[in-house]
């Protein structure tokens, strides 16, 4: 079992970079501090995202950090983005820095950023399984580098109150290595009824930093599903039809 370091040795203060203060009066209420992992995967839960979020938006939010992979979580039935994602970083320092974005405003939404957690299996170790490409858009092998399983329970203290929307996905590791090792259950973390979350007041919203995302350079997302009604052969005709016309 890996050793952990706590991140309570740092003051998470707001500044113009779009970060929020952890545990402040305008935040998400009191949370028990989690431990930072000392070995991969270094994965953060990012919640309360707009429903039209795509991968490029996540890259822009954490543009100064070393991102390894991004997974936007979708509804299994509708394939719609559920409003949260998992971001794996190359090193623990980037994960630690990402936690300072908790409470930052993106539009009219207050971001939720926390350490993603998995559940240890009964036989020891963190479970994983081998398989083909993820059917939710992760790409690459589904084998876990860090041994996390998407069906494992985890506990980051958030409710699954996200519905609908459209989002993008990441094709895989941006450095041609294994994709994000963390395969978490398609649902945000849950906590007991003592969770003290409230929406910030208008006065608190006015005092919090805002993240500014530039307009997308590509009008149509790269991962948009192709039109099923489009012609398979384009402007060309099947060979049988061409031969028949020549004979006439």
Curated annotation (Swiss-Prot):
Subcellular location: Cytoplasm, Perinuclear region
Key words, A-Z: Acetylation, Cytoplasm, Initiation factor, Methylation, Phosphoprotein, Protein biosynthesis, RNA-binding
Disulfide feature: none
Compositionally biased residues, Basic and acidic residues: 131-163, 196-207, 237-248
Amino acid composition bias (Gly residues), ranges on this chain: 15-29
TM spans (from-to): none
Classification via SMART domains: RRM (SM00360)
Region (Disordered): 1-41, 122-248
Residue span(s) of domain RRM: 42-118
GO cellular component terms, semicolon-separated: perinuclear region of cytoplasm
Major place of residence: cytoplasm
Ligase listed as a keyword: no
Annotated positions of the N-acetylalanine modification: 2
Compositionally skewed regions (Polar residues) per UniProt: 220-230
Expression sites by tissue: Expressed at high levels in heart, liver and testis and at lower levels in brain, spleen, lung, skeletal muscle, kidney and embryonic tissues. Both isoforms are expressed at similar levels.
UniProt-listed SUPFAM superfamilies: RNA-binding domain, RBD
Role this protein plays: Stimulates the RNA helicase activity of EIF4A in the translation initiation complex. Binds weakly mRNA.
Family matches, as PANTHER family: EUKARYOTIC TRANSLATION INITIATION FACTOR 4B/4H, EUKARYOTIC TRANSLATION INITIATION FACTOR 4H
Protein name per its UniProtKB record: Eukaryotic translation initiation factor 4H
Originating species: Mus musculus (Mouse)
């Amino acid at each position: 079992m890996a050793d952990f370091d706590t991140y309570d040795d740092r003051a998470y203060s707001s500044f113009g970079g779009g970060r929020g203060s952890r545990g402040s009066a305008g935040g998400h209420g009191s949370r028990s501090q989690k431990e930072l992992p000392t070995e991969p995967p270094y994965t953060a839960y990012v919640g309360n995202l707009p429903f039209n979020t795509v991968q490029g938006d996540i890259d822009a939010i954490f543009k100064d950090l070393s991102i390894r992979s991004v997974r936007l979580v979708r509804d299994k039935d509708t394939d719609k983005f559920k409003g949260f994602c998992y971001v794996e970083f190359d090193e623990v320092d980037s994960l630690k820095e990402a936690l300072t974005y908790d409470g930052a405003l993106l539009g009219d939404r207050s971001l939720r950023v926390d350490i993603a957690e998995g559940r240890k299996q009964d036989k020891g170790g963190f479970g994983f399984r081998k398989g083909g490409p993820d059917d939710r858009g992760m790409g690459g092998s589904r084998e876990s580098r860090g041994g996390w399983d998407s069906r494992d329970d985890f506990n980051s203290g958030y409710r699954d109150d996200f519905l609908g929307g459209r989002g993008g996905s990441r094709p895989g590791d941006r450095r041609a290595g294994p994709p994000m090792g963390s395969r978490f259950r398609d649902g945000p973390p849950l906590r007991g009824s003592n969770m003290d979350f409230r929406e910030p007041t208008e006065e608190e919203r006015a005092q919090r930093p805002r993240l500014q995302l530039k307009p997308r350079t590509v009008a149509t997302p790269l991962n948009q599903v192709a039109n099923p009604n489009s012609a398979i052969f384009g402007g060309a005709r099947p060979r049988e039809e061409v031969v028949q016309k020549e004979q006439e």
